[in-house]
Amino acid sequence: GLIAYFPEPSFITKNDLALDCALTIRRLVYDGLNPVFEQNDYPGINVRIGLDSGDAYVVTIGSPATKSHKDIIGSIVSLSAKIQSLGGSGDILLGEVTERNLHTMWREICEEIELKKDWKYKGMDGEPYKVYKVKFR
């Protein structure tokens, strides 16, 4: 797994940057790495990506006397993982906040997905938190 953290230059810009990064990772894996793996009789790898926006904090776990490490914590980290788990191979899924704050050109390639009945996450309005999928041609 991989967690990417996009700190502020601006809230809106970081949503666009996060989606651009996700599209680049997907393209690199499926158009760059997998063809080379397959030519050498290795299985390709699959990725699915979940994005959302909100407060996250970079913290140091441990002390200088021990092997400390950095981690990213916050409810948004857990929600992004839950969003990612809804996808299939090659999918890029976005939470409602991320989709709403994307530039129009990015929003045009996203469509809301139907959520399973066991999806428990609610938005600020008390309604089920929406999830969007990036459409590929």
Where are these predicted regions, by residue range?
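Intrinsically disordered, glycine/charged-rich C-terminal tails and inter-domain linkers
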Residues: 89-137
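Catalytic core of nucleotidyl cyclases, primarily class III adenylyl/guanylyl cyclases
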Residues: 1-14, 33-73
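Short amphipathic C-terminal alpha-helix that caps PH/PH-like domains
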Residues: 21-22
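Serine endopeptidase catalytic core focused on the charge-relay Asp
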Residues: 25
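Solvent-exposed amphipathic alpha-helical surface segments
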Residues: 29-36, 105, 109
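Catalytic/regulatory signature loops of cyclic-dinucleotide turnover enzymes
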Residues: 52, 75-100
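Conserved, well-folded catalytic cores of nucleic-acid-processing
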Residues: 28, 32, 86-89
